[in-house]
Structures are given as structure tokens and as C-alpha cells.
A protein has these predicted regions:
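Gly/Ser/Thr-rich phosphate-binding loop
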Residues: 88-90, 103-161
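Conserved G/P- and acidic residue-centered "switch" motifs that form tight phosphate/ATP-binding loops
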Residues: 13, 63, 120, 145, ...
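Conserved ATP-binding/catalytic segment of the ANL
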Residues: 181-221
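Alpha-helix capping/helix-boundary segments
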Residues: 73, 94-96, 123, 187
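Conserved AMP-binding A3 loop
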Residues: 4-32
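Conserved AMP-binding/adenylation subdomain of ANL enzymes
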Residues: 28-40, 48-88
């Protein structure tokens, strides 16, 4: 059970990229027990990213139909959504903004969409409100995860809110001096040729993300 099976590289946004060693058994185990669903899912995120692997493993565990774009231009993605009646689109706020700017959503029928999930970067409140205007029947869900700890289950306060709860049975969270700390069953075994300085001795990962807490338990990252 304690064998490495996956190496992901960090983005290197705060220094040299780090090679992160994951236990693949633990990652795969977190997707067990999911029910089959008759949905069409567009695979948007790349597989060198924890979010892309999350999309792939989720789809395989539920036996859903996957659509793979040749590239990620808004026009092409919108065309695929119309052609294959895509139900779920995972994307970044930047890409969703490009869809609106390009008006690809006006040239193609995207009414099959039931859910748009977003993450990897902050979602501006103003953009989320615009998206809800153009996609009023779509549920918007904010996702959260890190390459070090994996993707956690989340619940958005509402489709037009950027507040969320991390309510994953495999994930613990706490807020220390305004910073989000995470401890999960799917976190890395270690780094190649690099220290674990962002982890505490008892396994908490210091994400570096500052959060705003609401009185009802939701947080804004």
C-alpha cells in the first residue's frame, strides 16, 4: 500500500518546479463506490494537473461518456458541447471569461449543460454573475484541491456565490492565522530531492491560500 505510483510536477510559480510522489492506490481508492451516471463529460483539464486526473478518475469510476477536445479554444469547446450534448464542463474562470468575450456561447447551442465546475484560480464575483445570466439553468460548483493533497469534495453556498465548504470525508481542514491548512488521505508521500517544509510534523499542508470565513461555516478562498 505504501508504494509510489504517480509523479506530478508543481507549476513552479513560487520557485523551481517540484516533483511530487503520490501513492496511486490511495488516489484511486478515493473514487470507489461511485454510482454510474448517464452523463456526457467534457475533459477540459490536462492530465499533468491534479484537476485533470480528478476528471478522468471520476469519469472512469462512474462509467460516463467522455469528450476530449483537440484544443481548448472557446469556439471548439462550444462546438463540441453542442455536437455531443455535453452535460458537465470543468474549466477555469479565465476560460469561461473567454467564452463570453468570444460570444461562442451565442453561436452554439450549449443548453445541454447541467453543471459547470470551476477552479485552479479565483473566480471574480462579477464574472460569476455574468455567467449565471448567460447560463441561468446551469449549476455552478467551485472545486478546490492542491497537487500536494488531491482534489477535495466541495459544496458551493449557491450557484452565484464564491463561498464554499470543503466537506470531504478524506480531508481535514483548519484555518491558521487566516491561512488554509489541509490534511488528507490522498496527500503526497514526499518530494523528489526537496524538503517537506510546507508540511507540519503531524501532516498538515500549509496551502498558502488566505481565506475569508463566514458565520455559517462557508469560506472564500
Amino acid at each position: 500500500q505504501q508504494h509510489s505510483g504517480l509523479i506530478l510536477f508543481s507549476s513552479g510559480s513560487t520557485g523551481a518546479p517540484k516533483a511530487m510522489i503520490h501513492n496511486l492506490d490511495n488516489l484511486v481508492d478515493s473514487y470507489k463506490g461511485k454510482r454510474g451516471k448517464n452523463i456526457v463529460f467534457l475533459i477540459f483539464l490536462m492530465f499533468d494537473h491534479i484537476g485533470g486526473l480528478n476528471s478522468l478518475l471520476n469519469c472512469l469510476s462512474m462509467g460516463v461518456t467522455m469528450v476530449f477536445p483537440e484544443h481548448r479554444e472557446p469556439e471548439h469547446v462550444a462546438e463540441l458541447i453542442e455536437k455531443y450534448k455535453v452535460n458537465i464542463l470543468p474549466a477555469s474562470p479565465t476560460f469561461l471569461n473567454l467564452v463570453l468575450i468570444s460570444e461562442a456561447n451565442l453561436r452554439y447551442n450549449m443548453s445541454s449543460l447541467r453543471m459547470i465546475t470551476y477552479g485552479t484560480e479565483p473566480m471574480p464575483d462579477s464574472l460569476l454573475l455574468k455567467l449565471k445570466t448567460f447560463f441561468p439553468r446551469v449549476k455552478f460548483l467551485q472545486t478546490f484541491g492542491t497537487s500536494e493533497t488531491g482534489i477535495s469534495q466541495t459544496t458551493s453556498k449557491s450557484s452565484d456565490s464564491t463561498f464554499l465548504k470543503i466537506d470531504d470525508p478524506n480531508t481535514e481542514i483548519k484555518i491558521v492565522r487566516g491561512e488554509l491548512w489541509i490534511r488528507s488521505k490522498t496527500q503526497v508521500m514526499g518530494y523528489l530531492n526537496s524538503s517537506m517544509e510546507r508540511f507540519t510534523e503531524d501532516g498538515w499542508f500549509k496551502t498558502g491560500d488566505l481565506v475569508e470565513e463566514a458565520s455559517d461555516g462557508y469560506i472564500k478562498i
